[in-house]
Amino acid sequence: ILQRVRIHVLPLINPVGMLNGTRANGRGVDLMRNAPIDSQEKTILLAGGHRISSYLPWYRGKAGELMQPEAIALCNFIAQEVLPAPFSLVLDCHSGFGFRNQIWFPYARSRLEPIKHLKEVYYLRKLFMQTYPHQDYLFEPQSQHYLTHGDLWDFLYSQSLESRNVFLPLTLEMGSWRWIRKNPLQLRQLLGLYHPIKPHRLNRVLRSHLILMEFLLHATLSYENWLNKSDAQELEQQALAMWYP
């Protein structure tokens, strides 16, 4: 497989934030709200991204400033190593939103505008559901949950449209709230809202997503086969009916 598919692993984008136990980087900026892209629709208060103060979470940074060094590093890496490929998938792994495992795709900025490759994502979802009918993932646009300004994957996906290559960025939200029911005492620390905390539970969470990662690897390997099948017009109509009624 590795003779035909390249795998890049970026284990950590925000080391200072990880060290400090915060979403923000060392300058108080939330990297996932830092891209120069704005929602024209109503975003969730504060959590959708704001420019009020770095003392508040989800701070975007000052208007007109360059992106933060970590965000620039990620964008440069994607532009140089990923976007030139005829087909590429990204899985951005996040801990802590909801009780279910969720796979999100752009846009985070709009409930009204679907991405150009909607039918391709829909067919990828269909393949996953057919291959693993008993999986526990909710697969849908991020905008089904909330809207944000400055989403890095919205920005990078928009950049990818300048070429004919297909770039599908996915975000895995691991349903870590379920672990609160197992161990309510972990809420005594902020990390407990987003993290299983106990080592054996953390290992179980990580193991549970290996099937998804293997599926995405094989989907990338055979992309030409299923991309051709995803070109049917009725697939786009089905996707619109499901996600943008």
State what each model feature region is.
Residues 1-245:
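Structured catalytic-domain cores with a bias toward divalent-metal coordination
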